[in-house]
């Protein structure tokens, strides 16, 4: 009896299977060239005010001799006009990049936020804009029109994968923190129309790592089928220095827990009953023409019913719309209007200028 040439037969069978799979994909109308891109509202360009860009000498007596200690609670911190980090709690330090320089609120490119510990969430809208504007916001990106929804214990991400042609996809993924402080998104299900995308990739001997060219992406790499994101590198200025220890879905947000192990002591607020607050202590702060030496400034919003909506690019507008007073120990208590309330009539229950 003549031996059957199994290896050639297996090779031919595999090749035919791959060709059939490639033919089936267009048949399900999932591969279409030239699909229109999802139009997200563009934020106004981030600007550094003239006073922040100009060279204003710092008097010797105002040079910073220590970092500015910081804490935040219930703050919606804008990284642009519409993308928000929900800071539930934060303890850290603001440090100027130039030794001895003050922390300049008018130039967020010139200081670093060193987070000791924090709990920070992002909702679906924020995740959409973060991924589309900052991670994959460049021409020819392999992923676009991304929509991310925290659901149950997973995130559901849909969008367009471009590999020669546009491939609409929906991916269900588990989230976890790696030992080196990155967010791991591990797909448990990948849908391309009615086709099992993970099974398809396996049949073709492919993976997300092989499919996606992420060389130009910001703060993300692929490892097999997992995506690894560096939370401190995917954000625009100010620069963040932090270590992620946990990530999970909570209350409709992708919740990130940071702990750098600095064990900074708790700060004592001058007015501890404020629900939504930022507090800055020690070091030197610059805000426009004002230099605050050995800073002691508590900042809250005029409307305490919801989180403090703060945008550092527009801090002076928020300050001008609010009010402040000195404390008995020469500190400042500042009441700012929420960024989203600028230009609107006073809200019911809002604390107005005395």
Residue ranges and their predicted role:
Residues 29-354:
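Extracellular/lumenal and peripheral-membrane lipid-interaction modules
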